[in-house]
Amino acid sequence: VLTTLWHHYEVDNIRVALRGVEAGATWDQVLHLLYPMPRYVEVTLERMEKMVRSGSVTGAVSVLRGTQYHSLLNHALTRYEEERSLFPLEVALDLGYRRNLWDVVHSLGKQDREMALKTIGMVLDIDNLLWALRFRVYHHLSEVEIINYTLPMGYEVADDDVRLIARGGD
């Protein structure tokens, strides 16, 4: 679980690299925004640099081939190309990371799983509720889009709670 939690920072670094590509930033500009990650990484600094130097978001995603992040981002590339917004790519990263974390928690032994579910489950519930609100209020997404951009599981927050927010209920 701890290694998977550490990947949260790797996901943030990938997001920073993609934003750097989109903004036309140099590698030196992006490098100073990255979390230092001396271990537990799948995407090395060298690979991050290749992403930024690729010159395009599509090229940056292709640099991630062979990692767990490539398929997540590749799946969202069509929507990125249609909208010219990093939003679908960033949501794909967030959802993929949290689904993986949920799976890792559920693979633990009974006692460890129960303890991890209480702490990590609560964080995932909060993320899900905040995402649903943010997607409705600030991004004006449809109910279906909000459901697609939130986690289908939770600890104490039920899917119906997220659906209620997506519909605009109190």
Regions found by a protein language model. Give the residues of each.
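Extended alpha-helical surfaces
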Residues: 1-170
